[in-house]
Amino acid sequence: NLYIPLATTEGALVASVSRGCKAITDSGGATADSYRVGTTRGAVFHVSGLVENDKLNTFLLNHFKELQQVARQTSGHLKLTKFFSRGLGRFRYVRFVFDTQDAMGMNMATIATTSVSRYIETNAGVRCISVAANYDVDKKPSWLNIIEGRGMKAWAEVIISEKTLRETLKAT
C-alpha cells in the first residue's frame, strides 16, 4: 500500500481521488514518465531594423558560450542550456532556457536573463526593452510551452477496463 497525503475541506474530492486510485490499481497500475525541459525567461530587444535584427541573431549564435558564462555567474545552481530567437520587425524576442536543477528557478532565470541582457546590450549595441516579454509565457497556459516545453514535463497513462469504468467509476 502507498499512502498519498491529501488535505482538503472538500470531502467529495477525497472520495473521487480514492475511486480514481482504486480504478488505477484494479487496472494494473499506471505508467508515468517525466523529464526536465528547463525554466524559461523571454526577453525582447529593440533594434534599428531588419539588418540589425539579423546581426543580433548572429551575435547570439556566435556568443552562446559567453552568454552561458554570464548566466552561470549569477548562480551556481543555474545553467543556460539553449535559447530560441525570433525576429519581428524592429524587435528580437529571445527565449532563454535554463536548467535550475531541483528549483522551479523563476527568480534565478530572471536574474540571469537580466545579466545576459546587459551583456548583449553592451556587446551587441542593442537595447533590451524587457526581460519578461511574454515569450516565456509564465503563469498561463500556452501552446508554445507545450511545443517547446517549459519546466518539467510529466506524462501518465492507464488503460481502464470497461468493467472498472462501470463498477468503480460509475461511467459507461
Segments predicted by a language model, with ranges:
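A structural signal for small-residue-enriched, beta-sheet-centric alpha/beta enzyme cores
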Residues: Y35-G42, K82-T114, R118-T172
